[in-house]
A protein has these predicted regions:
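Long, well-ordered amphipathic alpha-helical subdomains in the mid-to-C-terminal portions
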Residues: 12-14, 213, 224-291
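Nucleotide-state-sensitive switch-loop elements of NTP-binding domains
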Residues: 2-41, 46-49, 58-144, 154, ...
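Amphipathic alpha-helical transducer elements in NTP-driven molecular machines
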Residues: 112-116, 120, 142-145, 149, ...
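Short glycine-/polar-rich loops that comprise or flank the Walker A/P-loop
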Residues: 67, 99, 151-154, 176-179, ...
Length: 291
C-alpha cells in the first residue's frame, strides 16, 4: 500500500492521485492514515485579493526555516469538463523546486460550494504525511469561502482595500467564518481606513477577530501573520471538535449518495417533466425509493 511521506513527493503524489480519482485501492490508503496534529490553514477571499501571492510569501518564510509545507490549491471546474481550468499557480512557480514544499492543484468537480469531499480526503492524506503546515487556498467563488471553514483549523480571509464598498457583505458573511482578516496590498490608498473599519466590525463579536495588514508581494506583515497562526494553533478551542463533526457529515453525505446515477436522474427527470401532473417532490420520493 502506498504511504504518504513528506520526504517522498513521488509516492505522495501517487497516493493523492489514487484518492482524487477514487482509483482501486484508495479506500485502503484512507483507512490506513495515521493521525497527526498538522494545522490546516484555509486561505480564502475574493478573486484578486492576492491569495496566491500571500501563500507564496508564507512558503518563502517557512521553507527558509526548514519547515515542510504542503499546499492544496483549489481550482474551479467547468460543469461540462472535469479538468482543472487554472492549473498550478504561476505565482508559486519558484516553489516547485524546493525539497520541503509540496504543491498540488485540485479541481472542485462541480461541488456547489467550491470544495468537495476529495478536498477533505486529500488534506487528510497530507496531514498523515507529517508536514509542518498545510495550506488550502480557494478561488473564493460561490460558497467556498464559507465551506472552507468546515475544513481548516484556521481560516484566513484575505481582502483588499478596494473591498470597502462591500463591507456590509463582509459583516453578514465572512465575519462568521474568519479566524483572522488579512488586509493584503496594505500599501494602497484607503488600506488603513479599511482595516480600521474591519476592526470595528470584528469587535462587535464576543471574540474580536484579529485584522492583520500585509503587503505579500514585499513580504511585509508576514511574520506577524505567522505569529498569529502559531498562537491560534496552540490556543484551546472547541472548533476542532466542530470540524471533525462537519467532516464526518460531509463524508457520510458523499458515501450515501455515491451509488446514485446522475445521468440516469437527468434522463428520468427529462421524461417526467413532460407530464402535466409532474411534481418534483413526488418524483424525488419515487426515484430515491427505487435507486
Amino acid at each position: 500500500m502506498l504511504k504518504a511521506s513528506k520526504t517522498d513527493f513521488k509516492e505522495l503524489s501517487r497516493a493523492l492521485s489514487l484518492v482524487e480519482n477514487s482509483v482501486a485501492g484508495y479506500r485502503e490508503i484512507l483507512l490506513g492514515l495515521k493521525p497527526h496534529a498538522t494545522p490546516i490553514i484555509g486561505i480564502t477571499g475574493p478573486p484578486g485579493a492576492g491569495k496566491s501571492t500571500l501563500v507564496n510569501a508564507l512558503l518563502n518564510h517557512w521553507s527558509a526555516q526548514g519547515k515542510y509545507v504542503a499546499v492544496l490549491a483549489i481550482d474551479p471546474t467547468s460543469p461540462f469538463n472535469l479538468g482543472s481550468l487554472l492549473g498550478d499557480r504561476i505565482r508559486m512557480a519558484e516553489q516547485f523546486n524546493k525539497p520541503n514544499v509540496f504543491i498540488r492543484s485540485l479541481a472542485t468537480r462541480g461541488s456547489l460550494g467550491g470544495l468537495s469531499v476529495k478536498t477533505i480526503e486529500m488534506a487528510d492524506v497530507l496531514r498523515s504525511a507529517s508536514f509542518d503546515y498545510i495550506l488550502v487556498e480557494t478561488v473564493g467563488v460561490g460558497q467556498s469561502e464559507v465551506e472552507i471553514a468546515g475544513l481548516a483549523d484556521i481560516t484566513l480571509v484575505v481582502l483588499v482595500p478596494e473591498a470597502g464598498d462591500e463591507i456590509q457583505g463582509i459583516k453578514s458573511g465572512l465575519m462568521e467564518i474568519a479566524d483572522a482578516f488579512v488586509v493584503n496590498k496594505a500599501d494602497r490608498e484607503g488600506a488603513d481606513t479599511f482595516a480600521n473599519t474591519l476592526k470595528k466590525l470584528s469587535q462587535q463579536k464576543a471574540t474580536p477577530i484579529p485584522v492583520i495588514s500585509t503587503v505579500a508581494s514585499k513580504a511585509k506583515g508576514i511574520e506577524e501573520l505567522i505569529a498569529f497562526i502559531d498562537y491560534f494553533e496552540k490556543s484551546p478551542s472547541i472548533k476542532k471538535q466542530q470540524l471533525i463533526a462537519q467532516k464526518a457529515w460531509q463524508l457520510l453525505q458523499q458515501k450515501l449518495t455515491a451509488g446514485l446515477n446522475k445521468e440516469q436522474l437527468q434522463q428520468d427527470l427529462a421524461e417526467a417533466v413532460q407530464k402535466s401532473d409532474f411534481n418534483l417532490y413526488q418524483f424525488i420520493d419515487n426515484w430515491t425509493s427505487r435507486s
